[in-house]
Amino acid sequence: MHIRTISRLGRFTALTAAALSLGLGLAQAQPESNDPIKLTLHDWTGQLITTNLMAEVLKKAGYNVELVQADYLAQFAGLETGDLHVAMEMWETTGREAMDAATATGKVENMGPTGMKAKEEWWYPTYMKEKCPGLPNWDALKTDACAEAFSTAETAPKGRYLGGPVTWGGFDDERVEALDLPFEVIHAGTDAALFAELESAYQRQAPILLWVYAPHWAPAKYEGEWVEFPEYTAECYGDPSWGSNPDMAYDCGKPFGEIWKVGWAGVKDKWPGAYDAIKAFSIDNDEMGAMITEVDLDGKTVEAVVADWIGKNEARWSEWIK
């Protein structure tokens, strides 16, 4: 009888301790506010993955999360007012000016790097080098022979450059004018359309010159090179007297660098735990490239790829929300 009582007491104590432990865990998971944290979605696969990853991790911590479709550059108006809260990918290559202007107001905060490094530039398949001798040096594009090699019925005698969607920015129209390139900029309607055209041209060995970025699967799948423009400096974009054209800015290539997280400055006060998790979020180019490949080439959904990553990396993301 005495032994059984002790046994029951031990079981009771263990269960009580477990319940208390669970209760403490749930208490820690309670969000500082039940208002939804609004993360912005854009129009390329990698950003959809990054944002859904962050959303799922925040949900694990008990936060209410809402995903909101928003224009890549115009979103800063919503981030400044607090109508939108976090943008998970602001690329140094295309968004630096808008980000700097927003953070200068004090209403938007740079929440640190994502861990990924951005590269965006004009890109061509290597089979085009024979038709445009001198590549990858950008000077080759100034010749009539190269313009003709990259021309289409709609742009001839000018060459055709396929840029990203207009909402991405990037200053390609300005670059063509500043460098006096005999090319016409045609903007793809979507990220998917951009790379569908690359796939079609590559299979036919047809002429194509387009915007390619990394992290992405395209530079790994296709054999090609980025055009080497004059190296970017801040002065190139801000001071017309800099560079080969003394009268115009943007006479250089795109900047390379970080992919940043940005958000409404009020996030750290309203949701301090979520703020810390967003700051801690980090993923590298190889991981992201592999996930983009799963979606774009293997036909998996963003949600499935994100769920797989969450399942395999609990030790990692749990550190972000502890």
Which ranges hold each PLM region?
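Short, well-ordered beta-strand elements
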Residues: 32-46, 63-68, 158-162, 278
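An extracytoplasmic/periplasmic, membrane-proximal ligand-sensing/linker region
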Residues: 34-37, 46, 168-184, 188-205, ...
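Short helix-initiation/N-cap motifs at beta->coil->alpha
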Residues: 42-45, 63-78, 186-197
